[in-house]
Swiss-Prot record:
The lineage of its organism: Bacteria, Bacillati, Actinomycetota, Actinomycetes, Kitasatosporales. This is Fatty acid--[acyl-carrier-protein] ligase ScoC. Mg(2+) binds at residues 167, 313. Belongs to the ATP-dependent AMP-binding enzyme family. InterPro entries: AMP-bd_C, AMP-bd_C_sf, AMP-dep_synth/lig_dom, ANL_N_sf, ATP-dep_AMP-bd_enzyme. ATP binds at residues 216, 312, 394, 411. Its EC number is 6.2.1.-, 6.2.1.47. Keywords: ATP-binding, Fatty acid metabolism, Ligase, Lipid metabolism, Magnesium, Metal-binding, Nucleotide-binding. It is an enzyme of class 6 (ligase).
Length: 519
């Protein structure tokens, strides 16, 4: 298959018109048996752009979407881009007060709303946006009342804001991360500039998006495929059995998932290599992956794997572990990856001094895909974006070859008798035990040592490992101060809708409402 790269496309305004002209009948979106071609995507997004202008919205105004994945979401994405408005995708799993905060904080003027989330809006403590467009049966008529011709051009450059995504709010209220068009083109261009196929798009590709569109990973993966002119398979909400069936039945060639989704697919009864024969590449990221899960995934899916690392603030991926580095037992299997061409990395200490290779500190990234700002939070922006560098809040190091290794979130480090202990290291070893499906490690208060290591464990199906079994397994592999002092077995690990572990929820069992979660 031929690789696809269209360097003349530099904004999402250009994407649908280009592909409507060159491959009008190619499916752009497949969703629950419905097909939207590139010509249809172009025309329907034109209608939405005209409608937004008719509703009095001007470039820079915020437009929110509260609903699950569907072809309408992508029509609205491109309609916003063409009208100059900024799309605010809202996590549909949030409560009414949480949704209200996002709509109020962003200053949303118009809300696209799926019917099933109407009760959420009704319960919001603040007034809803001035205009609500229902995505039910009346939506087609609403669109049809507007022209499908190209809207009057507005001033747009790669630096023009196009989306505002809210962080998951694991440490306080969610912040609105403003992203420009360049966030969805810079990495594609970087790979093409060096002829790298770490992640690539090819003629005939059909891409599964398991990650929600309100998450940077889902939105980025969708736009990369639209920019290439390939087909996106949208899942209303991720379900492991459905994902496996879609891969097998639709002949899906690429997929973008978080590690938890890989685990769920592999543990579905009867699932095996026969279900993944058309896959050529799996892109994963969003949370740490254990070596055991990665090696099992490589064996069963039997395709190329690429890990992506980044933040919403970096415009998704800034670092990639390419397929060639995915060698079971290899030294790079624990790496986050290598910066793309044009992306720089460094590690700093608490005083902001750059550290040498191998020294652990805060990972910082300078990428052309980085955010514009935190919406309405200049002080927070200045803390995170310093002289072009995004301060990730992740503890890690860079090796002599430039590969980035992430140890953990800095705030998640456990301080045991003055020694920093990183949960991800312990979790990775624990999940290598055949009786462990998943493990989460947190620090709990200890009067003698400051903190002790507490391990939450989800047992593998049909297994009942004892704390003694796990301790015996860990002793040869970890220093004594890293060993969990206690093990607690749980049925499942709490996660947010993006698949990230809600570590704070587990930690708060020990620390309660204390603002200082360290002794």
């Amino acid at each position: 298959m031929d690789r696809l790269h269209h360097p003349q496309l530099q904004t999402l305004v250009q994407t649908t018109s280009f592909h409507a002209q060159h491959e009008p009948t190619t499916p752009a979106v497949l969703c629950e048996g419905r097909t939207l071609t590139y010509e249809q995507l172009h025309r329907e997004s034109n209608r939405i752009a005209h409608a937004l202008k008719a509703a009095g919205l001007a470039p820079g105004d915020r437009v929110a979407y509260l609903g699950k994945e569907s072809e309408h979401y992508y029509e609205i994405l491109f309609g916003c881009a063409k009208s100059g408005t900024v799309l605010v995708p809202v996590n549909w799993r949030l409560t009414a007060p949480e949704v209200s905060h996002i709509l109020q904080d962003s200053g949303t003027r118009l809300l696209f709303l799926e019917d099933e989330f109407g009760p959420v809006v009704e319960k919001m403590p603040a007034a809803p946006p001035e205009t609500i467009v229902a995505l039910g049966e009346s939506f087609a008529a609403w669109k049809a009342s507007h022209l499908d011709t190209d809207p009057k051009p507005h001033d747009v450059t790669p630096d023009t804001p196009v989306a505002q995504l809210y962080t998951s709010g694991t440490t306080g209220l969610p912040k609105g991360v403003v992203l420009a068009h360049r966030s969805f083109f810079a990495i594609r261009d970087a790979l093409a500039s060096e002829g790298l196929d770490w992640i690539d798009w090819r003629v005939g590709d059909i891409a599964l998006i398991g990650i929600p569109g309100f998450h940077i990973g889902g939105l980025w993966w969708a736009t990369q495929n639209f920019n290439a002119g390939t087909t996106v398979v949208a899942m209303r909400a991720f379900a492991a059995r459905q994902a496996v069936d879609l891969i097998r039945d639709l002949g899906i060639t690429t997929a973008c998932v978080v590690p938890a989704m890989l685990r769920m697919m592999l543990t579905e009864p009867g699932v095996g290599a026969k279900d993944f024969t058309t896959l050529r590449k799996t892109v994963y990221g969003g949370s740490p992956i254990s070596e055991a899960l990665l090696e099992e995934s490589l064996a069963v899916l039997d395709c190329e794997f690429a890990q992506i690392y980044g933040l919403t603030e970096t415009g998704n991926t800034a670092v990639c572990l390419p397929p060639a580095a995915h060698v079971p037992g290899g030294s790079l299997m624990q790496a986050a990856g290598h910066p793309y061409p044009g992306v720089r990395s460094k590690v700093i200490d608490g005083e902001g001094r750059e550290l040498p290779p191998g020294a652990v500190g805060e990972v910082c990234l300078a990428t052309p895909a980085r955010m514009v700002e935190y919406w309405g939070l200049p002080d927070k922006t200045a803390e995170t974006l310093v002289d072009g560098w995004i301060h990730t809040g992740d503890a890690g190091y860079v090796d002599e070859d430039g590969y980035v290794f992430i140890r953990d979130r800095i705030k998640d480090a456990i301080l045991v008798a003055g020694e920093n202990v990183y949960p991800a290291e312990i979790e990775n070893v624990l999940e290598g035990h055949p009786g462990v499906a998943e493990a989460v490690v947190v620090g709990a208060p200890d009067e003698r040592w400051g903190e002790y290591v507490h391990a939450f464990v989800v047992a593998a199906p049909g297994q009942q490992p004892s704390p003694r079994d796990l301790h015996t397994f860990l002793v040869p592999q970890l220093a004594s101060f890293k060993l969990p002092a206690r093990y607690e077995f749980i049925d499942s690990v709490p996660r947010n809708p993006s698949g990230k572990i809600l570590r704070r929820e587990l930690r708060d069992r020990f620390w309660g409402d204390s603002a200082r979660k360290v002794n």
